[in-house]
């Protein structure tokens, strides 16, 4: 589409802004406050066990302020971005700006800590394999909602719909194929923290981008907090009791991958 064919009186009819007027609207204090409150309200408390709760509390959350907190780094394997651009493996700090001092002190090992705070993301994977295609397959892999390797034993033999119009086949079945989440190490972090922390609490904070199978770690977590892309500050408000969580799950969490395939 050439520039000459664009409608003349729409988006760029008046391209000039009034900075003073923009400052009143974009990022104004009132709007930011409402936005932050919306983030807090969306956070869901999925589990709050009494097993390691402080005396006088029904659950382990909220945490008392002033504790020593261990927060492991996340390890993410090679993945694909938009247009299937290759992304290399990386290690990232889930709290790059540090733990605010009003909540507690971040320590470098579980042995020093009073509590472990493990940030994870729902399992993510690459659902297509050029290697599978080169070896005579159709290239399609199962989309796994669990961290450990998943083999699709109960998938359809023939897919409901065909694939790309450029393909010379219509069956995208992935029956019998295996896939693994590229953030499988999130599960390792939870299990390793559970072993290292002994009888001290482990709190899991999950960024939920899609449904996930939680049976792999639910028993190892004293509390599970789910959020859908909010700021870390809002999550910490819930964990340390500055905000009482009121959110509800907008999606179903499957028991296992068999339940996903059979629905």
Stretch-by-stretch model annotation:
Residues 1-17:
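Long, well-ordered, tryptophan-enriched scaffold segments
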Residues 1, 17-263:
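C-terminal non-catalytic regions of proteins with extracellular/luminal or membrane-system context
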